[in-house]
Amino acid sequence: MADHMMAMNHGRFPDGTNGLHHHPAHRMGMGQFPSPHHHQQQQPQHAFNALMGEHIHYGAGTMNATSGIRHAMGPGTVNGGHPPSALAPAARFNNSQFMAPPVASQGGSLPASMQLQKLNNQYFNHHPYPHNHYMPDLHPAAGHQMNGTNQHFRDCNPKHSGGSSTPGGSGGSSTPGGSGGSAGGGAGSSNSGGGSGGSGSSNMPASVAHVPAAMLPPNVIDTDFIDEEVLMSLVIXMGLDRIKELPELWLGQNEFDFMTDFVCKQQPSRVSC
């Protein structure tokens, strides 16, 4: 079949100007002008058509060589399909389905950030300190996930519940209805189940009140983040709720060590702990 096409092209281009009758572009019949005096004018076009001929089937739909060039060139075409010399080779095939997509913009990365915030939602904490300078407005569209009301975490460290260490002396609660603090600089109650709401979080935006642990300042890096629902589900899954004698859950480590040492000394027949 190739010999038949070459014979047809030999009859079509009898003079064989510059040896172009052996070119794949002319064997495929991709030339636009049949007369020989147009070949020298269209020689770069024919050469680029032959170059792009094997890439046309990667495009979408059926197209000829010229439309394939313009489709593959995208917005970088000049002079109706002739590529500029400084154009990168990757830019000529930027619409091919085998090429990587362009660099994602900020709008493309926003859904991924929102999905990560959904996955990390249990690590957001309602903290009494207003960290305005620690909370840059990175994702304003995802702010509704940070100021939600379904936050089940509270700060279980009582040393952060006082109101005298906050700017202006206003204390705050780690959960709505949690431990309260006096607005004049007085110490708040350490009872985490108190009924009075904190007054320190009222002068803060809702998007700043819930900040992730990685964005907290270093002075509260030792704050305990405890989710009671996750903890209880872990206890139920391990069967610890059915075990009645677990002194290490109710006593400190020193008392537990003392009890185990005392019991082991009283009963020497047992294996030592």
Swiss-Prot record:
This is Cbp/p300-interacting transactivator 2. Residues 137-204 are annotated as: Disordered. The keyword ATP-binding does not apply. Keywords: Activator, Developmental protein, Differentiation, Nucleus, Repressor, Transcription, Transcription regulation. Transcriptional coactivator of the p300/CBP-mediated transcription complex. Acts as a bridge, linking TFAP2 transcription factors and the p300/CBP transcriptional coactivator complex in order to stimulate TFAP2-mediated transcriptional activation. Positively regulates TGF-beta signaling through its association with the SMAD/p300/CBP-mediated transcriptional coactivator complex. Stimulates the peroxisome proliferator-activated receptors PPARA transcriptional activity. Enhances estrogen-dependent transactivation mediated by estrogen receptors. InterPro entries: CITED. The gene is CITED2. Belongs to the CITED family. Residues 165-200 have a biased composition (Gly residues). One of its GO terms (molecular function) is chromatin binding. It comes from Saguinus labiatus. Interacts (via C-terminus) with SMAD2. Interacts (via C-terminus) with SMAD3 (via MH2 domain). Interacts with LHX2 (via LIM domains). Interacts with WT1. Interacts (via C-terminus) with EP300 (via CH1 domain); the interaction is stimulated in response to hypoxia. Interacts with PPARA. Interacts (via C-terminus) with TFAP2A, TFAP2B and TFAP2C. GO terms for biological process: adrenal cortex formation; cell differentiation; left/right pattern formation; positive regulation of DNA-templated transcription; positive regulation of male gonad development; positive regulation of peroxisome proliferator activated receptor signaling pathway; regulation of animal organ formation; response to estrogen. Pfam families: CITED. GO terms for cellular component: nucleus.
